[in-house]
């Protein structure tokens, strides 16, 4: 063994291949000894020694099985291998220690020999003994020890006088200590080896296996002790062989060996057993949710995972299942779903509300635009027509009368065109409102034909036929129905040169196909076959096998509901609804087949030749169609060129609860005259040889009655009660057969005087128009009426107006009334002033509402004519101030705060004492060019008594003064 290996052997100790904690590692790796209390965490755990539901017989059966025996043999072989390996390692360590001991002894012997040699030469000559270079080098190269105080960079210097014997003695003592420590470690290892051998001999594989199973069982109980699950095993008969975490009310003997039916009862048990049988039959695992409601644990929801158990031969011998209570999760899930539904509904409502708000805003803007356009256009037109009417009261020659008649007629046409455009715009923007009133269909048809016959100059026969099944009274928008009929009759007269024009009204035996009454609301579907529908409902007096055009290219208005006012279109359960069909037929020029698709489009006519020859804007039929659809009906046409046309519309109408047949004017007998009637058969005819006059002022206003292509004669039921029925059964005119000559002569010029009979007839017509205008003005819509049939009017209108003016002007001066006119437009001031002065009344003029209040404070007036739109203060605000003063006796400044100082400054005026009379109320009449019914409602709400629509005329002003001025 060389010097390099023996260098400093006393400081070198061979490193053992066994760690110091060999016992602990061995115990942790092989678990061959019982762990101490401080090492086994499960030893200190306090398990509840509850009766386990483990089948011990089953466990022993598994241990004695072939697989269990093979596992036991494996554990025995593993234990023997570990024991042999441990003995081998110990022997190797002991051999290494013995070798190190021998080397140390040899080194010690060498040191002793060297020391003896030095002792023998001690008494020789003393000299410095240098250390050999080899020894110096060896000492320098020797690795530093743990307790060595010399640094590697320090030079080794030994004095020659150094005592070598002491040095080597110290070295020997150090080696002795190292050897003793090594021997002590060897003895400790031997003791541990003997102890491990004893421990290995005291343990058997069965005990170790049992301990492992016990620890696993304790761990399983610890994990599943508080888990919300049920684990169970059932055999092929679905009897429990094992269950864990069952309900505490049941003992082991109440569960083991029994089925679900024997343990539980209630909802969900049968369903779960059927699923278990399906799993056993199919051999596939499944996962389901079961809802139980049993007396044992109440209503619960479990999510269950069921898997089959197979034998070695592959047969299904049972099922294992794991069930977890998810009742709280299901409840939260249902709540979340309900919250999501409510959020979706709320979001949908917000979206719908936003859409409705947007639509409402658009509608309001459209209505505002229409109101502005109506006001801005009708105001200057009012000045033109009113001035022309005033001019008609002056002295004119024949040519001037004719020119003035043309001027009035043209103004009427312009005003009618404006009304048509406004009607169409209101329908399309949703601003058109319908009003449900009770009316008599027979009278409507009768007066429409009567109005058309009044100005008819063609050799045509106007006839009407009312079915026996038509009710005496129905509920609907009579003004819109009259507007549709008048327009269709006007077109029929315009395009018919000879023959007849008529109206056929009857009730359908069944309702319109595609329409139904559900929930009190009218619904319909678009018609897929309009031609078939038209042929099915064709009831024209003549055979109409012609081309048919319906409303198929437009969605039926009643599908989305009918815009309503006063519950129009709302049919309550129990209300009887009838479907009225009206056919307007003629024997005129007809309509070419190629023009039928364009018939109901705006600004479209059958051909350019028709437009040049007959005139018109092409809006009449479009408005009729939209009005019919707005009321929930349909409009169709059957026509053939050169053979005539038949326009038919069907409308739903309600029958009033009470009907009184005793005072029906249609049931009165008639005889003689210029027409014949048969009330029993419901038919009447207007013959062409005599046509009664109907006075139609070009600037007269028929409120809420906008007709296309002709005038209208409004005859509300309350007027019918006041009028005297004539001998011919009608209420418009008496027998005019004797007056036809004078009527024809009168049309030649205004200078020819008329007979007393004609004057009486015209006076009757004027009175009827006055009452009609008064009733219809309460509805708010205003329309200028041009003439009964535009191309058929005569020049007698100027003369009649002049005659009416002369009668009005002859009033005595004692009837002079004090009138305040509040108007900012100079033209309107001139018109009203001229008319009022010619009627013999005094007038004061102011330009805005503030000036009107100051004028009222200084003077008492019999009536106030007030414009609505004015600067500084409009008519509505001024009316509120006036009504507030009349009620309280003082000027209330709370109506308009910005005018507090202006109004308050005049409270002390002594001139306003006349206004403080108790109960004194000055009539205030609005003068507006707005054609919307909302304008009338605003006026009445502000405190006004009535209103006059512009353009104004003598008739309107006279009626107003007669109604509201106190009798003189």
From Swiss-Prot:
<feature type="modified residue" description="Phosphohistidine; by autocatalysis">
    <location>
        <position position="375"/>
    </location>
</feature>
<dbReference type="Pfam" id="PF02518">
    <property type="entry name" value="HATPase_c"/>
</dbReference>
<dbReference type="InterPro" id="IPR001789">
    <property type="entry name" value="Sig_transdc_resp-reg_receiver"/>
</dbReference>
<comment type="function">
    <text>Cytokinin receptor related to bacterial two-component regulators. Functions as a histidine kinase and transmits the stress signal to a downstream MAPK cascade.</text>
</comment>
<dbReference type="Pfam" id="PF00512">
    <property type="entry name" value="HisKA"/>
</dbReference>
<keyword id="KW-0902">Two-component regulatory system</keyword>
<dbReference type="InterPro" id="IPR004358">
    <property type="entry name" value="Sig_transdc_His_kin-like_C"/>
</dbReference>
<feature type="region of interest" description="Disordered">
    <location>
        <begin position="737"/>
        <end position="757"/>
    </location>
</feature>
<dbReference type="InterPro" id="IPR003661">
    <property type="entry name" value="HisK_dim/P_dom"/>
</dbReference>
<dbReference type="InterPro" id="IPR035965">
    <property type="entry name" value="PAS-like_dom_sf"/>
</dbReference>
<dbReference type="InterPro" id="IPR036890">
    <property type="entry name" value="HATPase_C_sf"/>
</dbReference>
<dbReference type="InterPro" id="IPR005467">
    <property type="entry name" value="His_kinase_dom"/>
</dbReference>
<feature type="compositionally biased region" description="Polar residues">
    <location>
        <begin position="738"/>
        <end position="754"/>
    </location>
</feature>
<dbReference type="GO" id="GO:0000155">
    <property type="term" value="F:phosphorelay sensor kinase activity"/>
</dbReference>
<feature type="modified residue" description="4-aspartylphosphate">
    <location>
        <position position="867"/>
    </location>
</feature>
<keyword id="KW-0418">Kinase</keyword>
<dbReference type="InterPro" id="IPR036097">
    <property type="entry name" value="HisK_dim/P_sf"/>
</dbReference>
<protein>
    <recommendedName>
        <fullName>Probable histidine kinase 1</fullName>
        <ecNumber>2.7.13.3</ecNumber>
    </recommendedName>
</protein>
<keyword id="KW-0175">Coiled coil</keyword>
<keyword id="KW-0597">Phosphoprotein</keyword>
<dbReference type="GO" id="GO:0009736">
    <property type="term" value="P:cytokinin-activated signaling pathway"/>
</dbReference>
<keyword id="KW-0808">Transferase</keyword>
<keyword id="KW-0932">Cytokinin signaling pathway</keyword>
<dbReference type="Pfam" id="PF00072">
    <property type="entry name" value="Response_reg"/>
</dbReference>
<feature type="domain" description="Histidine kinase">
    <location>
        <begin position="372"/>
        <end position="655"/>
    </location>
</feature>
<feature type="domain" description="Response regulatory">
    <location>
        <begin position="818"/>
        <end position="965"/>
    </location>
</feature>
<dbReference type="InterPro" id="IPR011006">
    <property type="entry name" value="CheY-like_superfamily"/>
</dbReference>
<feature type="coiled-coil region">
    <location>
        <begin position="169"/>
        <end position="204"/>
    </location>
</feature>
<feature type="coiled-coil region">
    <location>
        <begin position="89"/>
        <end position="120"/>
    </location>
</feature>
<dbReference type="GO" id="GO:0005886">
    <property type="term" value="C:plasma membrane"/>
</dbReference>
<dbReference type="GO" id="GO:0009927">
    <property type="term" value="F:histidine phosphotransfer kinase activity"/>
</dbReference>
